[in-house]
Amino acid sequence: MPYRVATGYSEKSTDDDLIWRTPIVKEELEDADNFLKDDAELYDKVKNESAVSHLDTIVMPIIFTVLGMFTRMYKIGRNNHVVWDEAHFGKFGSYYLRHEFYHDVHPPLGKMLVGLSGYLAGYNGSWDFPSGEVYPDYIDYVKMRLFQAMFSSLCVPLAYFTGRAIGFSRLSVWLFTILVIFENSYATLGKFILLDSMLLFFTVSSYFCLAKFHTMRKSPFSARWWLWLCLTGLNLGCAISVKMVGLFIISVVGIYTISELWNLLSDRSVSWKVYVNHWLARIFGLIIIPVCVFLLCFKIHFDLLSNSGPGDSTMPSLFQASLNGTKVGKGPRDVALGSSIISIKNQALGGALLHSHVQPFPEGSEQQQVTVYGYSDANNEWFFQRIRGVEPWTDAENKTIEFVKGGEMYRLMHRLTGKNLHTHEVPAPISKSEYEVSAYGDVDLGDYKDNWIIEIVEQVGEEDPTLLHPLSTSFRIKNSILGCYLAQSGKHLPEWGFRQGEVVCLKHASKRDKRTWWNIETHENERLPQGEDFVYPKTSFFRNFMQLNSAMMATNNALVPNPEKFDGIASSAWQWPTLNVGVRLCEWSEKSIKYFLLGSPASVWPSSIAVCALIIHVIFLTLKWQRQCVILSDPVERDVFVMAAFYPLLAWLLHYMPFVVMSRVVYAHHYLPTLYFALMILSYYFDMITKRWATRNTGKFLRLGAYIVYGSIVIAGFFYFSPFSFGMDGPVDDYAYLAWLPTWQIVEDIRNT
């Protein structure tokens, strides 16, 4: 006779599964308890199992967490040099401690936590973490690394409780946790001051909270239901606030939510009022909370970075003027013809400074390039000159101050090269439908296409509305002959243009098109009084937020492989699940402590096979379903498949496939969140296959033996490759035995030969 304990036992379940399934409400437990008392033998078995379970719930997570801390923290300070991307993220943490504004492609939460680790370690932010340099005595880098290692270590108990929440048997929960503990790539990167462990932690915690929320679906709107819903949203917000890769786990939760709402729509027991409440609750928990977390991180970011720093130029000019120690906005308030040296900034999202350099366009007019450039540079400096056909302004007119006015026509001349800003009916290098903009001629040589009309579109403040004022005047620049408008296209030039932004002359431009809006950012003129007492208006947080995120995306999109340069650590996505390559994380000399980023073969290769098997499995189930065959008829088995196989596969695909198709340069560490879901799928197959053996007494021992053997292989494999994670000292030839594949660059860098 088949028995069912609460919601977690069926004909296909084993005794080991009794207490590992979905939550048991009090009434169900009491009914099951009374029912089982009629069968004394089964009653004793369940009671004994329950006692073991309570012990297991407390003791095993602690043991596993301690093991995880060991693998991440053992010999964590052995290498006292700046290792790999510690050079980036340690420096960013220093900026927070110095309160200097900087620019990076990633959202701020992870780097703020790096800064917090430095603060807790007593570091004052005075060092910039030069790559490969020895840490100075006044930086307690071990404490900073331990702070990061805690995030990686805490993934272990999260994996344990996730396995329980999604319905794994005890053996599979243990196996899944062991796979996470003894994964060399996690142990290696978990030692250093990086963002990867933080991203992994919030990704893992997001799926854990989703799994717990899933177990509460029979008790909607209860306190625990709300708790796990809000915690899911909180962790999603943190994940995307560390790296934009957090969008992938948000997509997983979004698809899960849509599926659940679709199922509720077909449930006749759910009234329309309740259904609408389900929508509103999820909008609050899974949209509003993550968005608020994301916005809050940027608000704290702006508040902390109140001083001028290396990233100022990526932000609007008015924002830069609000920073302490800035040079922006310190010049005279009115711009004069000839004598005023200015820089001009575009106001589109990701807008940069008008720029020119001596290199010509390789095609088209072959005249001097005009671009936009995001950083301060002498090649950003221009000045206004009288139009072609009129006597040019010269220094001899030192007693005459002629201010630049809106509605008037001028030439713009590049200060360093003396050439005119020019356009003509030549296609732009990237945006072929628009006109090319170049620098051409000189003060005497040129044509009437050098003449531009200044159109003022917005004035902030109460100054003379007819004049150009630095920062507070927004204007457009229209060619007097062709009628097109100077604009930043938003596209980047190839390597011959140093990957700077393309400048075009737009033929058809709306007045509200911010790509055609410009403002003067810096202004120098010794003949005019300085406007030091002028108070600039505050910029809005949301405009600053949008501008910074646009600049982040533009910088990220510019990180494309350069075919003319060799990148020894870049790789292709197909090489990650196959372990085709690893990454040298530091100097590779005899005297240095060397680390090699590579996944554990004992877990990565089987997990990749499991993912491929599951893809075939899902296709097979889909074909059966289309033929109206019954699939996954057991509700418990179906629930485990959904949360332990289907959604992990979806998460694997969403985390992996973007790196297959994206054009930017990618590295092996991008696979770490993806690997977590592959390990979950591998554990699911162990659970599903071996559970069928347990229907016979001999099968139970066979099942236990399979777990013990494979778990031992995983642990032994970790320690075999532990030099990768704990550090390799001495000659690299001593570790040649670890190079199982010729592409593993343990002894020699074969990709650079």
Curated annotation (Swiss-Prot):
Carbohydrate-modified residues: N124, N324, N398
GO biological process terms, semicolon-separated: fungal-type cell wall biogenesis; protein O-linked glycosylation; protein O-linked mannosylation; regulation of endoplasmic reticulum unfolded protein response
Domain of life: Eukaryota
Disruption phenotype: Affects O-mannosylation activity only when PTM1 and PTM2 are absent.
Cell compartments where the protein resides: Endoplasmic reticulum membrane
GO cellular component, one term: dolichyl-phosphate-mannose-protein mannosyltransferase Pmt1p-Pmt3p dimer complex
Signal peptide feature range: none
Pfam families assigned to the protein according to its UniProt record, in alphabetical order: MIR, PMT, PMT_4TMC
Up-regulation conditions: Specifically induced upon tunicamycin, DTT as well as rhodanine-3-acetic acid derivative OGT2468 treatment.
GO MF annotation terms: dolichyl-phosphate-mannose-protein mannosyltransferase activity
Membrane topology category: Multi-pass membrane protein
Major subcellular location class: endoplasmic reticulum
Transferase keyword on record: yes
InterPro entries: GlyclTrfase_39-like, Glyco_trans_39/83, MIR_dom_sf, MIR_motif, PMT_4TMC
Residues in the Lumenal compartment per record: 72-148, 196-235, 304-602, 661-665, 725-753
EC assignment: 2.4.1.109
Pathway assignment: Protein modification; protein glycosylation
Regions of this protein lying in the Cytoplasmic compartment: 1-50, 170-174, 257-282, 624-639, 687-703
Family to which the UniProt record says this protein belongs: Belongs to the glycosyltransferase 39 family.
Job description of the protein: Protein O-mannosyltransferase involved in O-glycosylation which is essential for cell wall rigidity. Forms a heterodimeric complex with PMT5 and more rarely with PMT1 to transfer mannose from Dol-P-mannose to Ser or Thr residues on proteins. Seems to have redundant activity to PMT2.
Other observations noted: Present with 2720 molecules/cell in log phase SD medium.
Protein known as: Dolichyl-phosphate-mannose--protein mannosyltransferase 3
Annotated source species: Saccharomyces cerevisiae (strain ATCC 204508 / S288c) (Baker's yeast)
